[in-house]
Swiss-Prot record:
Organism of provenance: Streptococcus mutans serotype c (strain ATCC 700610 / UA159)
UniProt keyword list: ATP-binding, Cytoplasm, Ligase, Nucleotide-binding
Cellular component GO terms held in the UniProt record: cytoplasm
Catalytic reactions of this protein: holo-[D-alanyl-carrier protein] + D-alanine + ATP = D-alanyl-[D-alanyl-carrier protein] + AMP + diphosphate
InterPro entries cross-referenced by the UniProt entry: AA_adenyl_dom, AMP-bd_C, AMP-bd_C_sf, AMP-binding_CS, AMP-dep_synth/lig_dom, ANL_N_sf, DltA, DltA-like
NCBIfam families according to UniProt: AA-adenyl-dom (TIGR01733), D-ala-DACP-lig (TIGR01734), PRK04813.1 (NF003417)
Protein name, UniProt field: D-alanine--D-alanyl carrier protein ligase
Annotated residues for binding of ATP: 156-157, 298-303, 389, 401-404, 503
E.C. code: 6.2.1.54
Matching Pfam families: AMP-binding (PF00501), AMP-binding_C (PF13193)
Residues spanning the signal sequence: none
Class in the EC hierarchy, top level: ligase
Amino acid sequence: MANKKIKDMIATIENFAQEQAEFPVYNILGEIHTYGELKADSDSLAAHLDQLDLTAKSPVVVFGGQEYAMLASFVALTKSGHAYIPIDHHSALERIEAILEVAEPSLVIAVDDFPIDNLQVPVIQYSQLEEIFKQKLSYQINHAVKGDDTYYIIFTSGTTGKPKGVQISHDNLLSFTNWMINAEAFATPHRPQMLAQPPYSFDLSVMYWAPTLALGGTLFALPKEITADFKQLFTTINQLPIGVWTSTPSFVDMAMLSDDFNAQQLPHLTHFYFDGEELTVKTAKKLRQRFPQARIVNAYGPTEATVALSALAVTDKMLETCKRLPIGYTKPDSPTFIIDESGHKLANGQQGEIIVSGPAVSKGYLNNPERTAAAFFEFEGLPAYHTGDLGSMTDEGLLLYGGRMDFQIKFNGYRIELEEVSQNLNKSQYIASAVAVPRYNKDHKVQNLLAYVVLKDGVEEQFERALDITKAIKADLQDVMMDYMMPSKFLYRKDLPLTPNGKIDIKGLMSEVNKK
C-alpha cells in the first residue's frame, strides 16, 4: 500500500520524469517508452497546441487504440489546459459522429486514421504528431487542468440513442486516485507493473493508468488486435511481467480458457482488480484456484462517480458463503446511501437505489443539461448521483449489489442502454419494429443479448432462411452499432406484445427469455 497522497497529476508525472527519467512508463509489445520521453513528447505537443490558439479549456478528441501516443496526447492536453475525449478506433462510425455532434471539440488528434473526412475542426494526423514529438519543444506549465477543470470526458450509452459525455474534473480524479493508492482493499504496490487492456474510451482504463502514473509504475498495453486472437493473447500474456491485472471479469474468464494462466506460469502476478461489471462467485472461485495467493479485488461504481466508489478484497469465506459477492466498503470521502422511491434514506439491510455523493461525483453530462438535471442533484449539502442500481448496506458498512433498476445493463464490461440498441436495430431497412432483451445466467450476469424483431412486409420472401435474414441485418447495421451492442440471437415475430398503455412490453419479453 502506497501511503502517499498526490495533489496534482501532472506535477506527479513531471517529478517522476526528473527522478526516474529512464524508467519505463509504457511498454506496448516490447516497444518501451520512458518517463523522460513522456515528458519530452507531451511538452512538445503542449507547446504546439498553444500555438494553435484553441479556445481555452475546450475539449479535444483523441482517436486511437492502446498506442503510447494516446497517453502522450492525454498528458499534453492536460498540460495545455484542455479536457480530452478518448474515442476508440474500433468505434462505429455513427457513434463517432454522435460524439462529435455532442462534444463540439476544438481539435481531433488522430493517433489512428480518422474515418471522417471534411471535418469542421482541425485534425492532427499521426504523421504530424510524430514530427511534433521530434521537435523537442520546451514547455512552461502555467495553465494546466486543475481543480474543477474537466480532466477527461468519457462517453457512455444514452437512452435517446445519443451518447452521454461524463465530465470528470481534476478534483474528481484526485479523489479516486488517492483512495485507490491508499485503500487497504487494493493494497496497490509501489511502482505497479500494470496490465493496460481496457480501451481508453472505457473508464475502467482510469483504474490502470491513474494509480500507475501516481506511483511511478509501468503500463503494459495489450491492443485489441492481440485480445481478439486467442492464440496471440495467451502467448502475449505469459510473456508480460505484470504484477497487477485490471480488467472486467469477462476478460479474465477469457484468459482462464488457457490452462497456462496460473500462478506457476505467472508467479509475479499478485493483484487482480475488477470493475465494470459484476464479479461472480464462480469466476472468483476459479481464479482463486489458479492464483491461490493473489489478491482479488471486487470494485464497484458508475462512470459518473469516477470509476469506482467501493471495493474489497475477496476472502475465502465470501467464496464459500455468498451467492453474490459484496461490492465493497465505500470511499471515506464519498458518503453513499440507499434511498427509497421518495428519496428518503433507508435503514441498513433495506434495499433501494444506491446514491453516491462527495468529491468524486461528476459535474454532469457535457452539453446535456436535461439529462444532467435528471441524474445529478445535491444530497445533504454534497453533489450526488442517482446510480440507478439497487443495493443495500450492512451494519458493518458493506455495500451489497441488487442489480439494475432500469433497462440499462452491463455486458462484457460495457454499459448498454437497451433502448439505444432497440433504436439502432430499427434503423435497418429490413426491420419494422425491434427490441433488445438481455438473457441472464444463474449468476445474475448478462449472458447474451437477444433481439425480438418484426420484419417489414415482403422481407421474409427475399431470403431462404431466418439465418440469412439475420446476416443481412447485421451487415446492414455494421456501421451503426458497436460490436458489443449487436444481439447474438434474433427471434422473428409477427408482432410484439404491448403493455396496457400501448408500449412494447419489454419486461414481459425479459420474463419470457429468462424463465426457467
